UniProtKB/Swiss-Prot annotation:
It holds the Pfam family BPS. The modification Phosphoserine is found at residues 372, 375. This is Growth factor receptor-bound protein 14. The modification N-acetylthreonine is found at residue 2. Keywords: Acetylation, Cytoplasm, Endosome, Membrane, Phosphoprotein, SH2 domain. Adapter protein which modulates coupling of cell surface receptor kinases with specific signaling pathways. Binds to, and suppresses signals from, the activated insulin receptor (INSR). Potent inhibitor of insulin-stimulated MAPK3 phosphorylation. Plays a critical role regulating PDPK1 membrane translocation in response to insulin stimulation and serves as an adapter protein to recruit PDPK1 to activated insulin receptor, thus promoting PKB/AKT1 phosphorylation and transduction of the insulin signal. Residues 234-342 form the PH domain. It is found in: Cytoplasm; Endosome membrane. InterPro entries: BPS-dom, GRB/APBB1IP, Grb14_SH2, PH-like_dom_sf, PH_APBB1IP, PH_domain, RA_dom, SH2. It comes from Bos taurus.
Amino acid sequence: MTTSLQDGQSAAGRAAARDSPLAAQVCGAAQGRGDARDLAPAPWLHARALLPPPDATRGCAADRRKKKDLDVLEMPSIPNPFPELCCSPFTSVLSAGLFPKANSRKKQVIKVYSEDETSRALEVPSDITARDVCQLLILKNHYIDDHSWTLFEHLPHVGLERTIEDHELVIEVLSNWGMEEENKLYFRKNYAKYEFFKNPMYFFPEHMVSFATETNGEISPTQILQMFLSSSTYPEIHGFLHAKEQGKKSWKKIYFLLRRSGLYFSTKGTSKEPRHLQFFSEFGNSDIYVSLAGKKKHGAPTNYGFCFKPNKAGGPRDLKMLCAEEEQSRTCWVTAIRLLKYGMQLYQNYMHPYQGRSGYSSQSISPMRSISENSRVAMDFSGQKTRVIENPTEALSVAVEEGLAWRKKGCLRLGSHGSPTASSQSSATSMAIHRSQPWFHHKMSREEAQRLIIQQGLVDGVFLVRDSQSNPKTFVLSMSHGQKIKHFQIIPVEDDGEMFHTLDDGHTRFTDLIQLVEFYQLNKGVLPCKLKHYCARIAL
């Protein structure tokens, strides 16, 4: 595992480092580490030519000398017409161009699924990584690369799933599957994959973190994260978990302790003394999975389950099932195990999209508007002379009016023959405009919405809009905040014969759902946070 960061970090990388509260500290901690793989000899150094036996060598030496002398006497010396080519540095280049080397990378066909169960077959080299597969699918489907696309390993027979880390070899993951297992690779967004680098305070609760040595003063979540990435000291994660007893269906509540060497449990209450700690699992030869339906599949006390599964193919008996009391506790355990298993490699995966972009500005790191759009200004053409609108409030009102005009034109196009009335425009607006938006999900239940948000990451601001199941002809905004999912009813309000949508009992009104979503993407309002990432179902 590579444990060093590149020194010559680009401007985009430094900008990303400033956004992360940990970047400056981690970059300093990563210096001075080497990679032993850089010193590995080339494969051709290990090959040995087949030598003839010593007796045969001595017996043929005299014959070769005689034959050489005869050849020299019989054949006259012919001058070389192109002496400059004998020592030309381009000779090897020409030879390589005329006789290309055979590609030694074997290719295999893999099948990748999306949320709607559509799939796509890809022919990939045997050494392709999960990041490269995601990039290939992004290019083939013309998606926007916002660095949240992720490859998942899905095990339906045991109800488990895990994030395949960006640096992992996909073919190696597939080689660990059993012949009769119907496992799948899923391609979807995961906004929470590296969220702990941006907001570590949500991932390490104070009551779950302790330190082997005494510390001076309070330790911040950023410092805790830095300790996970260092090689000297590691924090300890502790707390009660439900563990499934081997070979039984029963679960037992035990006090667990996570250390660098592995996961332990106490045989005597909450004691951390070595004589009371018993080894439970290590990280090197196993992967951490999240349980999708723990109660139904494994009879767990809660649905916040996770487990250790050996890398090699094995049955359900090899699983070490655990279960937390709440989502925040499970997230803390899983995140800490990932950090202890991969260490600095995770930080390198997080920083990889921002490195090596010296030829680009910081605006090219994330999907943004083009320079031509950013340079536009609001203009007023109503008077005799055109003028630039410098007042931001006036400019905003103009933009809203233009948006409403665009929506009315869309309603006219959606109407039937002839000029539609105001009521038909209103119905067309409510029925058709939001249907084309990726954040809107028609006829989605509350349970399906929660499952989709959890799949794409419990990050603050992840949201979707859906039809209300309890109140027909109304809508619900489902969003994530504080690692919990909240649902807000979008209430219809009528004023002077026109219908509006509101979240705050009519104090803020919107003519359609698009305007409502755009407003709360810029303003917190009555919501716990702004809307940041929408959940969308893609088709491959």
